[in-house]
C-alpha cells in the first residue's frame, strides 16, 4: 500500500489563499517603522523632566487604513508620589503640576553683588537671591527704575514661569515683556488698577481670566498664568491662526510683522547703551511699526499663500516653550498691540450680550493701558473698527466662539494645552505630507478608564512590555482601583491574558473577573476589546470584557 502523501491543496495552500485585504500586510515594514518614529516623536514633544513641566505620553494608539491614519493619545495624570503636599520649601510657594503658564522672557538680571545672572540660572539654587533693579548700563546707575519687589522671589522651576504669588501686582512685575523701564508705568498702572479698582474686579472680563478657584486668598491672590494676554503672550498662535483661516482673508505675514515690529534696541536692554538718547527714537519706531502692522493686517493685497509661508517659523518662535530659554530675547507683540487682538477674540466670548461698542469702551476704560498713547486712542479705535468690518461680524463671531470654547474648556492649563494643540496641528500636516495619507490626530480625554474595554486592554498590554510583571499582580492592582473609579452601570469586568507570562517556558492562559460577568446571555450588554503586546518571550494576548447593567 502506497504511502499517503500530502494533498496538493495543502502544499499549495499559500498560493491558493485569497489576497489579504489588510493594508498592513503589504506595508508591514513601513508601518512598523512609521509607528516607531511617531511614538518617539510624540514622546519627545514636551517630555517632563526634573526641572521642567510637560505631558507624559501614556498611550499612543495608531490605526492605519489605506487612505487614513488614526492616532489616539492617552495622556495620564501625574503619579501621586510626585505631588507635593504642604511640605514645601519656606522660600517657595506650591505650584501645580499642570501649570504650563509662560510669561514674557525675563532676560538678564543683575543681583546686588553686581554679578550678571543669565535667565537660565534663575531657577536654580540661587533663585532666592535678592533682585532689586534692572540695570540699563553700568554708567547710568542713577537712572535705574526699581520695578522688582524687594522681598525674595521664589521661582518654581528652572527655565519656566514663576511660582504662585500671593499678590498679582507683584507677579506682574516679573514679566519680562515689561522689563524696559520705559514701560514700567504700564506695569505699575495695571497693578494699581487691579489692587484698588473694585469695579474692575466685578467685570466678567476679570472673572474670566481670574476665576474664583485661583482667588482663595483674596481678590489679589492669583496665579501668574492667569494674567491677561497683554501681559501673558501665550495665545498668539490661536489668534493668528484664526485670522488666517477666515473666509474674508485678513492678510498679513506674522513673521515679517514680528521682525519689523520689535526694535533692536528694546530687545535686550541690559546690553543697550545710551538709553536716554534712543528713548525718543525707539518710541517713534514702535509707533510706526504698530501703524505698519495694523495697515498690513487690514489690507487685501497679499494672498493667503504668502501668509502661510511665514506661519511655521512664527509658530516655532512664539509658541515653542524652548524659545523662552534664549538669552537674546524679543519683546512680545501683545504688550503694545495686544489689546486689539485681545478684544475681537474675547469680546464676543465674554460679553455675549453686549455690543462691540460697549465691550470696546469697557475694555479701554477699565484696563487703561498706556501703550495706547503711542498712537493715540482715536487712531487705534479707527483701525479696530476697520479690522472688524473687513473680517465680517458673522464669520468673526463664528470663529471666536469656536476658539473661546476650546480655551474655556481647558482654561486650567491655558498655555500647556494650546501648546499641545499647536504641536498636534503641525504634526497633522507633517504626517499627511510624509505618508501621503489623510492623517487625523485626535486627543482622547477619558474620565474613567474602567468604563470602556479598549483602554483597559491597552493599559494591561503596556505593563508587561516595560517590565516583567505577572498577570496576577496586574489584575490585583486593577481590582484595588475598580471600587474607587468604576462608574455606575458597570456590573463586572473579566480579563484574560494568554502567552508566556513573565518568561515562562510554557504558555498558559490566566483569567480573572470582578463582579458579575456573563458571556452566554444574548441580551447582556458587553464591551469587548483585545490587545497584543510583543515581549522578548513572544506575543502576549489580552482580552477584556465589561458587562453593563440593563
Curated annotation (Swiss-Prot):
Record's keyword terms, sorted: Mitochondrion, Ribonucleoprotein, Ribosomal protein
Gene Ontology molecular function: any one: structural constituent of ribosome
Main location per the UniProt record: mitochondrion
GO BP annotations, alphabetical order: translation
Location in the cell: Mitochondrion
Signal peptide range: none
GO cellular component: mitochondrion; ribonucleoprotein complex; ribosome
Disordered: region residues: 112-133
Record-given protein name: Small ribosomal subunit protein uS3m
Cited PANTHER family: RIBOSOMAL PROTEIN S3, MITOCHONDRIAL, SMALL RIBOSOMAL SUBUNIT PROTEIN US3M
Family membership noted in the UniProt record: Belongs to the universal ribosomal protein uS3 family.
Keyword Mitochondrion: yes
Amino acid at each position: 500500500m502506497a504511502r499517503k502523501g500530502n494533498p496538493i491543496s495543502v502544499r499549495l495552500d499559500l498560493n491558493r489563499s485569497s489576497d489579504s485585504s489588510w493594508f498592513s500586510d503589504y506595508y508591514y515594514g513601513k508601518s512598523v517603522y512609521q509607528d516607531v518614529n511617531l511614538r518617539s516623536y510624540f514622546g519627545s514633544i514636551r517630555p517632563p523632566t526634573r526641572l521642567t513641566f510637560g505631558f507624559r505620553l501614556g498611550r499612543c494608539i495608531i490605526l492605519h487604513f489605506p487612505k487614513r491614519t488614526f492616532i489616539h493619545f492617552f495622556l495620564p495624570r501625574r503619579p501621586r508620589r510626585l505631588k507635593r503636599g504642604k511640605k514645601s520649601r519656606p522660600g517657595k510657594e506650591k505650584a501645580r503640576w499642570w501649570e504650563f503658564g509662560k510669561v514674557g522672557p525675563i532676560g538678564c538680571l543683575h543681583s546686588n553683588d553686581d554679578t550678571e545672572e543669565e535667565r537660565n540660572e534663575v531657577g536654580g539654587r540661587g533663585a532666592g537671591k535678592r533682585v532689586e533693579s534692572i540695570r540699563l548700563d553700568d554708567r547710568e546707575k542713577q537712572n535705574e527704575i526699581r520695578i522688582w519687589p524687594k522681598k525674595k522671589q521664589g521661582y518654581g522651576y528652572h527655565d519656566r514661569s514663576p511660582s504662585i504669588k500671593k499678590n498679582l501686582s507683584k507677579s506682574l512685575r516679573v514679566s519680562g515683556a515689561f522689563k524696559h523701564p520705559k514701560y514700567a508705568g504700564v506695569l505699575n498702572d495695571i497693578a494699581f488698577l487691579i489692587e484698588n479698582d473694585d469695579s474692575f474686579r466685578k467685570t466678567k472680563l476679570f472673572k474670566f481670566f481670574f476665576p474664583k478657584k485661583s482667588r482663595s486668598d483674596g481678590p489679589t491672590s492669583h496665579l501668574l498664568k492667569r494674567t491677561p494676554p497683554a501681559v501673558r503672550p501665550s495665545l498668539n498662535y490661536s489668534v493668528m491662526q484664526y485670522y488666517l483661516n477666515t473666509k474674508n482673508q485678513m492678510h498679513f505675514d506674522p513673521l515679517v510683522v514680528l521682525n519689523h515690529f520689535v526694535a533692536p534696541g528694546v530687545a535686550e536692554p541690559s546690553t543697550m547703551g545710551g538709553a536716554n538718547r534712543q528713548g525718543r527714537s525707539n518710541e517713534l519706531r514702535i509707533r510706526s511699526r504698530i501703524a505698519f502692522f495694523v495697515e498690513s493686517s487690514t489690507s487685501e493685497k497679499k494672498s493667503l499663500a504668502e501668509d502661510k509661508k511665514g506661519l511655521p517659523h512664527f509658530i516655532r518662535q512664539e509658541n515653542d516653550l524652548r524659545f523662552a530659554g534664549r538669552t537674546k530675547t524679543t519683546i512680545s507683540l501683545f504688550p503694545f498691540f495686544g489689546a486689539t487682538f485681545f478684544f475681537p477674540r474675547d469680546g464676543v466670548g465674554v460679553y455675549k450680550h453686549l455690543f462691540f461698542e460697549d465691550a470696546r469702551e469697557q475694555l479701554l476704560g477699565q484696563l487703561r493701558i498706556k501703550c495706547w498713547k503711542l498712537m493715540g486712542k482715536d487712531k487705534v479705535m479707527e483701525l479696530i473698527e476697520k479690522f472688524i468690518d473687513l473680517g465680517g461680524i458673522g464669520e468673526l463671531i463664528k470663529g471666536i466662539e469656536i476658539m473661546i470654547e476650546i480655551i474655556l474648556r481647558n482654561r486650567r492649563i491655558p498655555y500647556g494645552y494650546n501648546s499641545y494643540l499647536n504641536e498636534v496641528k503641525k504634526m497633522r500636516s507633517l504626517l499627511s505630507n510624509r505618508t501621503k495619507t489623510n492623517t487625523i490626530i485626535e486627543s482622547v480625554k477619558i474620565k474613567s478608564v474602567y468604563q470602556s474595554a479598549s483602554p483597559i486592554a491597552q493599559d494591561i498590554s503596556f505593563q508587561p512590555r516595560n517590565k516583567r510583571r505577572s498577570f496576577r499582580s496586574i489584575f490585583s492592582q486593577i481590582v484595588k482601583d475598580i471600587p474607587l473609579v468604576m462608574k455606575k452601570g458597570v456590573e463586572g469586568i473579566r480579563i484574560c491574558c494568554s502567552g508566556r507570562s513573565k518568561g515562562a517556558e510554557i504558555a498558559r492562559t490566566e483569567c480573572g473577573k470582578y463582579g458579575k460577568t456573563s458571556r452566554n446571555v444574548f441580551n447582556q450588554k458587553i464591551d469587548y476589546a483585545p490587545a497584543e503586546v510583543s515581549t522578548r518571550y513572544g506575543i502576549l494576548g489580552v482580552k477584556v470584557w465589561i458587562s453593563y447593567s440593563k
